[in-house]
Amino acid sequence: MQNPKKIAVVGSGLVGTLLAIYLKKRGHTVHVYDRSPDIRKINFTGRSINLVLSDRGVKALRDVGLDQEVLGIGIPVEKRAIHTGSDTVNEQFYGKDGEVIYSLSRGLLNKKMVDLAEKAGVEFFFGEKVWDVDLTTATISIGESERGEWTTHDYDLTFGADGAFSRIRHKMQRQSMFNYSQEFLNIGYKELNIPANADGSHKLDKNSLHIWPRGNFMLMALANLDGSFTCTLFMPHDGENSF
């Protein structure tokens, strides 16, 4: 076992929370910072595409004893259901009998992971904006605005898990010989919803990932625990049949 360290994780998303649990279980003091409010106390309006959890993700959870906790809020998905037109549906199983992936609400999973991390002893600091990090000392700087007054917090290690507009990566990019590239696809998405039947049951097979492929655009649907389906329409930003 390593000597206990004081560690900061910037970002309370799925990666940040799981990393924090791993570090805490190894005996470290772990603080998680996030500029957003506590996701458990607000209506979730972030990225809403359902998350599909495969065997690799299950293993990552199993290694810290959390797989059953998380799978309890998911729906097993054993196959793709390809809706090619009319009433034709082609089924493609993901593996042998019993081999499945899991459909989970991203927001519900994130809330669960924060709960599990807190239960493990991780401390969270929500609404705290990290603007800078000293890459040599791991000291982080927090303040209300980028040009305002900052307070510093000293750590032995700081991990960046703060997403697409990461302040940690921003600081790393200013180092010599640091390569970074960013590309944008000409594909966007919109969330749609298939509500549950009046009795709360699913309108489609809940254990399938439903796909309606139509050339350069497609619709997919994954089941939720409440009987609904979260659907995602993928289309080009421009041109015919686009957003």
Features from the language model and the residues they span:
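A structural signal for isolated positions on well-ordered beta-strands in alpha/beta enzyme cores
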Residues: 8, 31, 123, 230-232
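Glycine-rich FAD pyrophosphate-binding loop
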Residues: 24-46
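Conserved Rossmann-like nucleotide-cofactor binding loop
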Residues: 15, 38, 165
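A conserved beta-strand/loop element that lines the FAD pocket in flavoprotein oxidoreductases
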Residues: 118-130
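Conserved FAD-binding catalytic core of PHBH/FMO-like flavoproteins
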Residues: 115, 131-132, 137-243
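N-terminal Rossmann-like FAD-binding beta1-loop-alpha1 element of flavoenzymes
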Residues: 5-32
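Active-site-adjacent segment of FAD-dependent monooxygenases/related oxidoreductases
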Residues: 42-116
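Short phosphate-binding/catalytic loops that engage adenosine nucleotides
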Residues: 28, 66, 122
